[in-house]
Curated annotation (Swiss-Prot):
Residues 347-424 form the OCT domain. It is found in: Cytoplasm. The keyword Ligase does not apply. One of its GO terms (cellular component) is cytoplasm. Belongs to the TRAFAC class OBG-HflX-like GTPase superfamily. OBG GTPase family. This is GTPase Obg.
């Protein structure tokens, strides 16, 4: 089975907690703080590997979690960072956030890497909190939780040329003739249910990769007949060979077939519909082909190059292959995804809302990535930790927002699942 989609969960390692410790030193209160920082959590990293062909491995393992950082220790000893987790995926995989649909990466080269989940930073030890007014702090931080997200992986085959058309028009026979690919061939619809790749080698030493895309039907752009799964693999091709049963042996009109598939490509992606196309008029060895070829040429000959061929006898295939090879250098490779790193950073930095305040029954509920991170990193079992958290709420404007909403002594506040009681 050819697995070209997978949904998985990834999580970076949590940061290690900072330590509360004091060294023994004469004339220094409590010996002076010496708690080290926690180590950073490991990252989850995807690496493109040309040796992998499908996403089948992700069918059996769906959760990937990097190691957490070690906790800090006394004597200003920092915790060791967690080990990164490297996950190999096939070249040609597009990585999406499954919850938002955002494209995170498009891995098209062997060895290309992308971090899909960062590890959390280590919590600061109490040595970091010493100041002129607090010579012996007893506060430290928990480690920051690692990033976590659900990912959708989509494998889009890397091919220069894509063979498209209705089922049973001869695409598999053509690819078996012009390359070493050995697809399953039979005289019934949907013989090909997975894409086949073949390398076409020319006499002058040049070569290109061709993909036999499983047969499309009307409504493919809506998913009919596994259309979405099949059309996905045409997105990377630079040149499309639209194969027609020019003899009409399936009692279909080849001109109408061309128009239907062209419309399916347009409905799926306008950029795909604009891709250069060569028309392959196959089955020229069957009676009725000449008449249909003449009619097709009259209708489409001015806009498209038409190549009459017979996959059964091999007639016309050499001319087709060399025409494709000649056209390819002039056609730029399509780009599925280009990430503007600077723009991405600016977007992240300019988030308009630092927190949100709502009411749920008797609770005031405060939510937001920043404040929730502070909750997770605060050691509430230490008085200094609670005092510091109160100062954070004040600095972020949360205290003022709660007062404006009419909070009173004894009211309940919930942040990141933890409940607090409001006091003066």
């Amino acid at each position: 089975m050819f697995y070209d989609q997978a949904k998985i969960y990834v999580k970076g390692g949590d940061g290690g907690a900072g330590a509360v410790a004091f060294r023994r030193e004469k004339y220094v209160p409590e010996g002076g703080p010496s708690g080290g920082d926690g180590g950073r959590g490991g990252k989850v990293i995807f690496i493109a590997d040309e040796g992998l062909r499908t996403l089948v491995d992700f069918r059996y393992k769906r959760h990937y979690k990097a190691d957490r950082g070690e906790h800090g220790q006394g004597k200003n000893m920092h915790g060791k960072s967690g080990e990164d987790m490297s996950v190999r995926i096939p070249v040609g995989t597009v990585v999406k956030d499954a919850d938002t649909g955002e494209i995170l990466a498009d891995l098209i080269e062997h060895g290309q890497k992308v971090v899909v989940a960062n590890g959390g930073r280590g919590g600061r030890g109490n040595a970091r909190f010493m100041s002129n007014t607090n010579k012996a702090p007893t506060v430290a931080e928990n480690g920051e939780p690692g990033e976590e997200r659900n990912l959708l992986l989509e494998l889009k085959l890397l091919a220069d040329v894509g063979l498209v058309g209705f089922p049973n028009v001869g695409k598999s026979t053509i690819i078996s003739r012009i390359s070493a690919a050995k697809p399953k061939i039979a005289d019934y619809h949907f013989t090909t249910l997975v894409p086949n790749l073949g390398v076409v080698e020319l006499e002058d030493g040049e070569s290109f990769v061709v993909a036999d895309i499983p047969g499309l039907i009307e409504g493919a752009h809506t998913g009919a007949g596994l259309g979405h799964e099949f059309l996905r693999h045409t997105e990377r091709t630079r040149l499309i060979l639209h194969v027609l049963d020019i003899a009409g042996s399936e009692e279909r009109d080849p001109l109408e077939d061309f128009q239907i598939i062209a419309e399916e490509l347009r409905q799926y992606s306008q950029e795909l519909a604009n891709r250069p196309i060569l028309i392959v008029a196959n089955k020229m060895d069957i009676p009725g082909a000449e008449e249909n070829l003449q009619r097709l040429t009259e209708k489409l000959g001015e806009d498209y190059r038409i190549f009459p061929v017979s996959a059964a006898t091999g007639e016309g295939l050499k001319e087709l292959v060399y025409a494709a090879a000649k056209a390819l250098p002039e056609i730029p490779a399509p780009q599925i995804f280009v990430r503007d790193e600077e723009q991405h950073k600016l977007t992240q930095a300019s988030a308009p809302h630092r927190f949100e305040l709502t009411r749920e029954g008797d609770f005031f509920v405060v939510s937001g990535k920043e404040v929730e991170k502070h909750v997770q990193m605060t050691m509430f079992d230490r008085e200094d930790g609670l005092y510091r958290f109160q100062n954070i709420l004040k600095a972020m404007g949360i205290e003022r927002a709660l007062l404006d909403e009419g909070i009173k002594v004894g009211d309940k506040v919930r942040i990141a699942g933890i409940e607090f009681e409001w006091e003066e």
